[in-house]
Amino acid sequence: MKVTDAGFFRSLVRLADDGWRMGWHERNGGNLSFRLTEEELRSAEEELRPGAWVPLGFSVPELAGTAFAVTGTGRYFRDAAVKPEDTFGLIGLDGRGENYRILWGFAHGGRPTSELPTHLLTHAVKASLPGEPRRVVYHAHPSNIIALTFVLPLSDEVFTRELWEMFPECPLVFPEGVGVAPWMVPGGRAIAEATGDLMKRYNIVVWAHHGVFCAGEDPDAAFGLMHTVEKSAEILMKVLAVPGGKKQTVAPEQLRRLSEECGVDLPERFLRDKPGQNP
């Protein structure tokens, strides 16, 4: 089977194209990766042409021998559907998780996204956690959530609570909350480690003044996380733009009732009363 005909690949192309159509991927903004199963990799093996090993510059032994579909550095999500072999590539890690090699794609001399450290450290974290594996890591630049990082305190508790209050799906879609990382130089080990640490607790990490990382079980789930958190941020931005701000909102006790009736666990630290608000 051709790589571009494989189900996992078509789902990635759709995610990239949908994200671009939402306006989340200006120019070459954003990146995407999918941790492949052995079966998924075998389905496309007739087209695999392993290249030379390239040092990662760090070690992820938890992912030794694993293959990934990844967007390329400098590539445009706008081109995902029309130039998939150029936009994406498949890479494989060696038996120590210290080197990678290109297996397919990245036409015209391309290479993996510059945010590969953050993707791999996030995948390493998610692969080690119990439950259904979150194999898709998605980074985008949604305008409203970025705008909020200029006006809200850069706090997990503040962002989570404000976003949960906007509409009921938010605490149901991301009941564990939202992590917030301060502004850091993108593409480096420091921001990768900070994101990986937050991904131990969250599936959505906001990069202040930059964008969002989401980790989902599949491309649909990853897109759904990004879509939900950005819609909530859009509503909040509109509320904050109204003179006088909020006149009423969802109270902690209402969120607790939602938690009980829908069977989700909302951490109590996000439900503490805000100044001037009665439960």
Q: For each predicted feature, which ranges?
A:
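Glycine-rich flexible loops
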Residues: 1-279
